[in-house]
Amino acid sequence: MQLEVILPLVAYLVVVFGVSIYAMRKRTAGTFLNEYFLGSRSMGGIVLAMTLTATYISASSFIGGPGAAYKYGLGWVLLAMIQLPAVWLSLGILGKKFAILARRYNAVTLNDMLFARYQSRLLVWLASLSLLVAFIGAMTVQFIGGARLLETAAGIPYETGLLIFGVSIALYTAFGGFRASVLNDTLQGLVMLVGTIVLLVGVIHAAGGLSQAVDTLHALDPKLVTPQGADDILSLAFMTSFWVLVCFGVIGLPHTAVRCISYKDSKAVHRGIIIGTIVVAILMFGMHLAGALGRAVLPDLTVPDLVIPTLMVKVLPPFAAGIFLAAPMAAIMSTINAQLLQSSATIIKDLYLNLRPDQMQNEIRLKRMSAAITLLLGALLLLAAWKPPEMIIWLNLLAFGGLEAVFLWPLVLGLYWERANAAGALSAMIVGGVLYALLATFNIQYLGFHPIVPALLLSLLAFLIGNRFGSSASQATVLSTDK
């Protein structure tokens, strides 16, 4: 173990727990559900931008994405910039309308919104189960990424790192709730920004300058400096699929959507769009360029996902590497706490309280259950991450795609199409989810497109056809989640 690397990381974790304790003490008056899962809808613009960005930027962006850039070259850096409008799309399309309706219905979760709009218990159960299955896959990826970071950069055995990482996140999320999550996201967003810039400068310096780094890549494989990338992987169909999966489809991610119902006012969302887009641009460009140029410094890595943690140790002094280790750790932690909290909210609010509505005001029981379920989910994820695959980006994209295939059209059409009904939404969710699962499982790529493209197209068609066989439900005027 390298103490110079570990000490700054321990200090960072202490700060994270300190923020969580502060958040617990700052809980405002109101019902437990609204405060614990939404922070009483009090986010300002900077916090909104940072939490949305930190939630979106995950192990895939700090570990898997740069790993792919290492393997395929500078073309992957250009591909990564396709994600630039993600915050603008999320807040622009969902933002105001979603927040207004959420306040009208007193919605705490995404499924509250779906029930208020479609008045279908079956739809809520299907959405809840889909969310839990996909989130378990997505969070497993984050746990693997965190443990690999500690293994490579700090010399901590994978299993030990997994325990340290998993227990820390489960504890601070369980007891701090949404307020702790978004405050830590803001801290983690700042850490990511500084860390990304420092590492990129270090990589360019170690490679002998930008020009020398590109020349080295060209000598290794001329395809590494072409827009198509190594193995000509970046075809038009691939790039279109990637844009749908990691940019447009983000609108349908539940942990992103829930951020759109928890901000304070219109000024916050406008500021959030501007700041969030700038932060995403810096992080995506910086991390992926560091991964691509890292091949000029480390040409012989056998596991591409190890490029960022290995570069940290190679190009930075040990203490600086420890400080920077907090950046990808921050990216991973912020994504997990958002998904962990959303999973807990789904089990408590959408499943348990649907079966036991008489427990809505039993705040003592709800507090205990929320913490216990969050800790239990954390333990299950530790078990799932114990034997990891080689490249985590594909597993992460698989989980992302599943969520988008199920939630995108019921969300967007539910907001903007008055005639949308439960029959259409259920048809879209079933067709999108099942088709995506089949295509992804058997690796079927029609005309070279990722499964998310045909899944979303046929899901939309299923919505339109199914909608003709249903009738519009009267929308709820208020949901009994708060008084």
Give residue ranges: language-model regions.
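Membrane-embedded helix-loop-helix hairpins and adjacent transmembrane boundary segments
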Residues: 1-483
